[in-house]
C-alpha cells in the first residue's frame, strides 16, 4: 500500500498540507461502516482537536481504564503522529473494543454506519459525563467555587441560577448538538406549546429527485394532528386537533444529516434501500431556523457513502474535504478526487441503475457563529 | 443520400409516437396555465443503444438553430428568425416587451424546406397516431430553411427537426476524442460557420450546420478547430456563445474559471499564449502574446468553474455564473465589472437575460430562481418553488401580459425555470408588485420590517459584488404553475414562438405547444377543424413579414 500512498503524495505535491496525515484503515471483515465514519470524524477538525487534547491531558494518568473513547483517542493520535504522510493503519484496538462492548457490532454482518456513528457519539458523551460528574463531586467537596472551564476542555453551563440542574454540556455537545423546537398549536384555543429537544444529527426523509434543502423544508413542514393522532391540549384539557411543526432553535456547529435511505416496506416485510437522487450542495443554509440563526452558512466537509443496492450488504466509503482538497477513503485506499466528483454520489433518478454509490451521512461545518 | 443517413439513425425506435410516451409513466401530457393549456406536442430523443458511455456522463444542453433560406441570406425575411438562440440579435433592442404589439397574432412557423407539405399533413394526426411512414417524412431538403434542435448526449451531438413529429434525430455526429459539452448557433453568421461546439477536453469547433446535415457520415465535417487538444486551456468547456453583433467573435467559458474570446478571422492553428494568472482570486483580462493567434484574450473570472454565460441581446453585457455562487455582469467592450452578487448559498448553474436587458435570471444550488435588476444592481426577487437545484431559466419573450395597455407602466414579464426536481415552473413578474415597493423609503412598505434593509436602501455602486442577501430582505415569488415534465432531472428550457422546449440531463426533449388562444387569429387562414389545436404551425407565409419584427430568443444554457 506504500505505493498508493506515494501516489497520493505525488498528486498533492508541494500542496500537501503541513502536518496533515492521510491514512487508510485496514478492514477486519465488514468493518467499512466503522472505517468510513472514523475518517469523517477524523477530518471533523474540532472533534479531532478536542479528542487529541483529551488524549494528551489523560496520557499521564497511567491507570486510565480503557474505554471506547480512549481507544478512539489512541487511534487518532496514532494517525496524527505518523512519520509518513500517507499509508495504512489498522484500527484493531478500537474495533476489538467496539465488538467487546456492543454485541450489535460483534458479528461480521453488514452494519449501519449511521447507527455506529450514533452509538459512538453517545458513548463518548456518556464517558465524558461520567468523568465530569466525578470531577464535579470532587470539586464540590474540595471547594464550592464553580469554575467556568475545567479540565479536558469540559464546559459547565454559565451560571444563571440553575447550574446544578442543567445537564452537563460536554465538548461533543458543543460540536454536534443542536436544539429543535417542536411547536404545537391547538386548533381550538390557538395556544402554542413549544417543547425543545436536543439532537446530535438530523435524520431526514428523502424523496426522489429532491435536494437536501427540500428535505429540510419537509422536515419542518406543518403537520396536522387529527383523528387517532390528536393532541392533548393542557388549556382545553382535552384531545384536540392541532398543528405541529419542527424548527431548529439552535443550529449545531457541526451539522450531521442522515438520509433515511433504508426504509421498512410493509408489503415486503423488510427494509429496502432507496437509491433516490438527493442532491446536496457544498454550501448550505438552513431554511427552518428561528432568528437570529436564519442565515448561518454551512460548508460540506465529509460524506459517508453507502455502496450497494440493498440494506443488508454492500460497502461504505467516505469523501472528505481537507485543506480544500477532496479525498476518497475506501478502507485502506486513499485517493484525491475532483470537487465535481462529489456529484456522482447523489443517487439515481431511476430505480434500477448501475450507480449504487449514494451519499448517506453528510457532515457540514458552520462558517458563522452558531453560539 | 439523406435517407441512408436517416435510416441508420432512426431505425431502432422510430415507431414510438410521442403520445405513447413509454418512458414517462404518470406524467401528464399537458399542463394548465391562466392563459390555457400547454400540450405535449413532440418528443425528441436519441437511440441510446448507439452511445458508448466511455467518457462518462454528460449533461444535455439544447440549442435552437434556425437555418434560413440559402438563396436570400441578406434579407431577414419571413423566416421566423425570432427563435434563434442566444445571439445574433442586431435589432433586438427595437422590440419592446409587454406592448402587445401583435406578437400574439404572429404565429408563423417556417416548416422545414421541401418536407413541408408532407410534414404538415402528418402533423395533424401526428401526435396520436402511430407513425408508419417515418422514412418518407424525413426526406427533408437541407438546402432549404428549417428549425433544428441541436443537443449533446455523451460523445455525440444530435440534430433534430423541430417541426417534425419524428422522435429520432436526423443527424448524429460522434466525437472520438472527447465529449461535446456546450454549443451555440448564430443564424446570421456570415461565412456559413454558424455552429459552435465546446468539448470536455477544452477543444472548440466552429462548423456549418447545413454542411453537417448534408453530410452522411457521423463525423464532424468542414470544422475549424481551436484550442487543439486543450493546448491553451485543457479544462472542460462549460458554456459557449457568439458575441451578438460581434462579427464572428465568440466566447468560451471553462471549468477552471477562465473564459476566452475568439475572433473568427484569426488563425486557430497558431497557439496563443497568455501570462500566468497573477491572483486567482481576482478578475483579470489578458491579451494573447501574438495578435494573430486565437484565442485573442483570456478573462479570468473566478476560482472554480464558470458554469454558464449569457450575452444581453445587444451584446453590450456579458453575464457569468459559477461555482463560487456569484453572478457577474461585465461590460464586454470595456472589460469591466458592472455589478454582481452572490446566491443565497451554493453554486449558480444557469443565467438568462430579459429581452430588454433589464433583468437577469439565475438558478442554482439553493433551489432558488433569482431575479437580478440591472437598474438596481441587486436581487429584486427570489422565486421559491423548486424542490431541487435550478438548472435552466429563461424569459418568455413571446409572452405579453393580457392586460398590458402598451404604456409600459405595468410591464409584466413571464419567465420559466426547470430544475433537477424534474419540474417546469412558470412565473409572472409584475413590476408594480415587486419592484416599486422596494424603492420606497425605509419603513414605507408595510411588507418589510423596518431596520432590516441595508440591502435595499443603499444605492449600490458600480463595479461591486454584493454578498448573499439575508433571507428576510428579499421579496418572494410563487410560481403560477409547477408541472413535472420529465422523469429525469432537467437541464434546459427555452421558449419559442409557439412552444416551450424542455430537456432532461439524459437527452430527452419535449416540445409543449402554447395554449391555442391564437387560434382565433389563425382561423382566417385555411381553417381546418384540426388546425385549432396546432394552429401555430399552420399560419400562412403572408404573415411572415410581420414576424421579422420579433427578434426573439432564449438563451439556452444547461
Curated annotation (Swiss-Prot), chain A:
Keyword Nucleus tagged: yes
Catalytic activity: Thiol-dependent hydrolysis of ester, thioester, amide, peptide and isopeptide bonds formed by the C-terminal Gly of ubiquitin (a 76-residue protein attached to proteins as an intracellular targeting signal)
USP domain ranges (all copies): 23-367
GO biological process: protein deubiquitination; proteolysis
EC number(s) given by UniProt: 3.4.19.12
Keywords: Hydrolase, Lipoprotein, Myristate, Nucleus, Protease, Thiol protease, Ubl conjugation pathway
Catalytic site positions: 32 (nucleophile), 315 (proton acceptor)
Broad class of enzyme this protein falls into: hydrolase
Gene Ontology CC terms: nucleus
InterPro entries in alphabetical order: Papain-like_cys_pep_sf, Peptidase_C19, Peptidase_C19_UCH, USP_CS, USP_dom
Keyword Phosphoprotein on entry: no
Motif (Bipartite nuclear localization signal) on chain: 83-100
Segments crossing the lipid bilayer: none
PROSITE patterns registered for this protein in UniProt: USP_1, USP_2, USP_3
Gene3D superfamilies recorded: Cysteine proteinases
Tissue-by-tissue expression: Constitutively and ubiquitously expressed.
Molecular function GO terms recorded: cysteine-type deubiquitinase activity
Subcellular location: Nucleus
Superkingdom of source: Eukaryota
Major localization class: nucleus
Residues anchoring lipid (N-myristoyl glycine): 2
Function: Recognizes and hydrolyzes the peptide bond at the C-terminal Gly of ubiquitin. Involved in the processing of poly-ubiquitin precursors as well as that of ubiquitinated proteins. Required for the correct development of pollen.
Family classification: Belongs to the peptidase C19 family.
Protein name as it appears in the record: Ubiquitin carboxyl-terminal hydrolase 3
Lineage: Eukaryota, Viridiplantae, Streptophyta, Embryophyta, Tracheophyta
Amino acid at each position: 500500500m506504500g505505493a498508493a500512498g506515494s501516489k497520493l503524495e505525488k498528486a498533492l505535491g508541494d500542496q500537501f498540507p503541513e502536518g496533515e496525515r492521510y491514512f487508510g484503515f485496514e478492514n477486519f471483515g465488514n468493518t467499512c461502516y466503522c472505517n468510513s465514519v472514523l475518517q469523517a470524524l477524523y477530518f471533523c477538525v474540532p472533534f479531532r482537536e478536542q479528542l487529541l487534547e483529551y488524549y494528551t491531558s489523560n496520557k499521564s494518568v497511567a491507570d486510565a481504564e480503557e474505554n471506547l473513547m480512549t481507544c478512539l483517542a489512541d487511534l487518532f493520535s496514532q494517525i496524527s503522529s505518523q512519520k509518513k504522510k500517507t499509508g495504512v493503519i489498522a484500527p484493531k484496538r478500537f474495533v476489538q473494543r467496539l465488538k467487546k462492548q456492543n454485541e450489535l457490532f460483534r458479528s461480521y454482518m453488514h452494519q449501519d454506519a449511521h447507527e455506529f456513528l450514533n452509538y459512538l457519539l453517545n458513548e463518548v458523551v456518556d464517558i465524558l459525563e461520567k468523568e465530569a460528574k466525578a470531577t464535579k463531586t470532587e470539586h464540590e467537596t474540595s471547594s464550592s467555587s464553580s469554575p467556568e472551564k475545567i479540565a479536558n476542555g469540559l464546559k459547565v453551563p454559565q451560571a444563571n441560577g440553575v447550574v446544578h440542574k442543567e445537564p452537563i454540556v460536554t465538548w461533543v455537545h458543543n460540536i454536534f448538538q443542536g436544539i429543535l423546537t417542536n411547536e404545537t398549536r391547538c386548533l381550538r384555543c390557538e395556544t402554542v406549546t413549544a417543547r425543545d429537544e436536543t439532537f446530535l444529527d438530523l435524520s431526514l426523509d428523502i424523496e426522489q429527485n429532491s435536494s437536501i434543502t427540500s428535505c429540510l423544508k419537509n422536515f419542518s413542514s406543518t403537520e396536522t394532528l387529527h383523528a387517532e393522532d390528536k393532541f392533548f391540549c393542557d388549556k382545553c384539557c382535552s384531545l384536540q386537533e392541532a398543528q405541529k411543526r419542527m424548527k431548529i432553535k439552535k443550529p449545531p456547529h457541526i451539522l450531521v444529516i442522515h438520509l433515511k435511505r433504508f426504509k421498512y416496506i410493509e408489503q415486503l416485510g423488510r427494509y429496502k434501500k432507496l437509491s433516490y437522487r438527493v442532491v446536496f450542495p457544498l454550501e448550505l443554509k438552513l431554511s427552518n431556523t428561528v432568528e437570529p440563526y436564519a442565515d448561518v452558512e454551512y460548508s460540506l466537509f465529509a460524506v459517508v457513502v453507502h455502496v450497494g443496492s440493498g440494506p443488508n450488504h454492500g460497502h461504505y466509503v467516505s469523501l472528505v474535504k481537507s485543506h480544500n482538497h477532496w479525498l476518497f477513503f475506501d478502507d485502506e485506499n486513499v485517493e484525491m478526487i475532483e470537487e465535481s466528483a462529489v456529484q456522482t454520489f447523489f443517487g439515481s433518478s431511476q430505480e434500477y441503475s448501475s450507480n449504487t454509490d449514494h451519499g448517506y451521512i453528510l457532515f457540514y461545518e458552520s462558517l458563522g457563529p452558531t453560539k | 443520400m439523406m435517407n441512408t443517413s436517416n435510416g441508420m439513425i432512426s431505425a431502432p425506435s422510430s415507431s414510438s409516437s410521442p403520445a405513447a410516451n413509454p418512458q414517462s409513466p404518470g406524467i401528464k401530457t399537458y399542463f394548465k396555465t391562466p392563459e390555457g393549456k400547454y400540450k405535449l406536442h413532440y418528443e425528441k430523443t436519441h437511440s441510446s443503444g448507439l452511445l458508448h458511455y466511455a467518457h462518462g456522463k454528460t449533461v444535455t444542453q439544447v440549442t435552437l438553430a434556425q437555418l434560413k433560406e440559402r438563396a436570400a441570406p441578406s434579407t431577414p425575411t419571413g423566416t421566423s428568425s425570432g427563435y434563434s438562440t442566444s445571439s445574433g440579435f442586431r435589432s433586438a433592442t427595437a422590440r419592446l416587451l409587454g406592448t402587445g404589439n401583435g406578437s400574439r397574432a404572429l404565429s408563423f412557423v417556417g416548416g422545414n424546406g421541401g418536407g413541408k407539405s408532407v410534414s404538415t399533413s402528418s402533423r395533424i394526426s401526428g401526435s396520436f397516431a402511430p407513425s408508419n411512414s417515418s422514412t418518407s417524412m424525413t426526406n427533408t431538403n437541407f438546402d432549404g430553411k428549417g428549425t433544428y434542435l441541436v443537443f449533446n448526449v455523451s460523445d455525440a451531438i444530435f440534430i433534430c427537426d423541430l417541426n417534425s413529429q419524428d422522435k429520432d434525430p436526423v443527424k448524429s455526429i460522434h466525437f472520438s476524442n472527447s465529449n461535446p459539452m456546450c454549443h451555440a448557433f448564430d443564424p446570421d453568421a456570415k461565412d456559413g460557420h454558424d455552429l459552435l461546439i465546446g468539448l470536455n477536453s477544452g477543444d472548440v469547433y466552429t462548423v456549418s450546420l447545413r454542411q453537417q446535415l448534408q453530410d452522411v457520415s457521423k463525423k464532424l465535417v468542414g470544422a475549424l478547430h481551436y484550442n487543439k487538444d486543450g493546448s491553451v486551456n485543457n479544462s472542460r468547456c462549460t458554456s459557449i456563445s457568439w458575441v451578438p453583433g460581434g462579427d464572428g467573435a465568440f466566447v468560451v467559458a471553462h471549468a477552471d474559471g477562465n473564459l476566452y474570446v475568439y475572433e473568427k478571422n484569426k488563425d486557430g492553428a497558431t497557439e496563443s499564449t497568455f501570462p500566468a494568472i497573477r491572483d486567482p482570486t481576482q478578475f483579470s483580462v489578458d491579451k494573447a502574446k501574438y495578435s494573430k493567434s486565437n484565442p485573442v484574450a483570456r478573462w479570468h473570472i473566478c476560482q472554480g468553474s464558470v458554469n454558464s454565460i449569457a450575452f444581453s441581446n445587444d451584446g453590450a453585457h456579458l453575464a457569468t455564473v459559477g461555482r463560487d455562487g456569484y453572478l457577474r455582469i461585465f461590460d464586454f467592450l470595456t472589460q469591466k465589472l458592472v455589478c454582481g452578487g452572490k446566491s443565497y448559498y451554493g453554486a449558480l448553474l444557469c443565467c438568462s437575460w430579459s429581452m430588454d436587458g433589464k433583468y437577469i435570471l439565475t438558478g442554482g444550488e439553493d433551489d432558488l430562481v433569482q431575479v437580478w435588476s440591472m437598474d438596481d444592481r441587486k436581487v429584486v426577487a427570489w422565486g421559491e418553488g423548486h424542490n431541487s437545484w435550478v438548472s435552466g431559466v429563461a424569459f418568455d419573450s413571446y409572452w405579453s401580459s393580457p392586460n398590458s395597455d402598451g404604456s409600459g407602466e405595468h410591464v409584466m414579464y413571464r419567465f420559466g425555470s426547470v430544475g433537477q426536481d424534474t419540474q417546469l415552473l412558470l412565473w409572472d413578474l409584475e413590476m408594480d408588485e415587486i419592484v416599486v415597493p422596494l424603492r420606497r423609503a425605509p419603513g414605507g412598505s408595510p411588507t418589510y420590517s423596518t431596520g432590516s434593509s441595508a440591502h435595499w436602501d443603499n444605492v449600490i455602486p458600480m463595479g461591486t459584488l454584493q454578498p448573499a442577501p439575508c433571507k428576510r430582505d428579499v421579496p418572494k415569488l410563487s410560481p403560477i404553475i409547477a408541472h413535472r415534465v420529465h422523469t429525469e432531472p432537467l437541464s434546459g428550457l427555452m421558449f419559442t414562438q409557439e412552444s416551450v422546449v424542455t430537456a432532461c440531463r439524459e437527452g430527452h426533449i419535449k416540445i409543449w405547444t402554447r395554449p391555442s388562444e391564437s387560434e382565433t387569429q389563425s382561423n382566417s387562414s385555411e381553417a381546418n377543424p384540426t388546425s385549432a389545436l396546432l394552429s401555430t404551425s399552420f399560419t400562412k407565409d403572408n404573415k411572415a413579414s410581420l414576424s421579422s419584427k420579433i427578434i426573439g430568443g432564449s438563451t439556452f444554457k444547461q
